């Protein structure tokens, strides 16, 4: 074989081999991308993702296909994300600290190392809410009643092993003499419906979910360091002398080992969306507290949660 012909054939072979072995090409995405939502339709995670989809469509031709996998405080959906195809055509929305709590409990089929982290998009403080017709006008009245009437009150939580559950555990640690029965729901839409229907007396939930029923709910306190811009007239728990700060963060991730080109594209596009002024305005209108974290900062935050939350779970006998 002549030298020129040999090297030409070799180059063609290498090019062909690369094309066959690479699952993602320059045209990614070439088809719709599946987005797994680990909670019920209509909940805060779904609402946020729908807003983000609008701006994904602004920058990307291929649309999202929403896949709902609710239940077990998000664990079912988080598992689906971890086990999804690594071709770049499936990623999902996840919640913190839910994912970390479930990992630490040793009941999950995933760990924090099961994912490629793409972005944090929301930091949503939690709050305490009752019906407007409730006898309780402030959190102290709830505490006093719970102390005198153990387990008579019911609190609705999304869970188990969710941010709502964590806030409940922190509450129990601060006030061991105040006994309140916990009731778990698959998602925030179910949780809100339970309070509206009288199944529970109060709920611990994130601001965005609760604000969607604000005409019928009374928000007693916010579990944040300072008053929230969406609820400027509602005092923090700290203002009431209760040292409890709790939030739920929404992030996006795909399975560990997903094609690097797809991961890069998703990270760049989500960051672009999160800095779009129109997106931020839509998030504000929807009561969604937007807060972007890049993948490295997000992973560092997750590692810090693993240390702090492990101790609380151990104290409650939820892990060894």
Q: In which residue ranges do the predicted regions lie?
A:
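Short secondary-structure boundary segments
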Residues: 95-96, 132, 206-208, 224-225, ...
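Short beta-strand->loop
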Residues: 111-121, 180-183, 201, 210, ...
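Sec/Tat signal peptide C-region and signal peptidase I cleavage site
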Residues: 20-26
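N-terminal (or domain-start) structured segment
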Residues: 26-114, 152, 160, 164, ...
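Hinge/capping helix and adjacent helix->loop/strand transition within the periplasmic-binding protein
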Residues: 56, 80-90, 103-190, 242, ...
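Positively charged n-region of N-terminal signal peptides that target proteins for export
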Residues: 1-6
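An extracytoplasmic/periplasmic, membrane-proximal ligand-sensing/linker region
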Residues: 30-32, 173-177, 258-320
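Bacterial N-terminal signal peptides
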Residues: 8-19
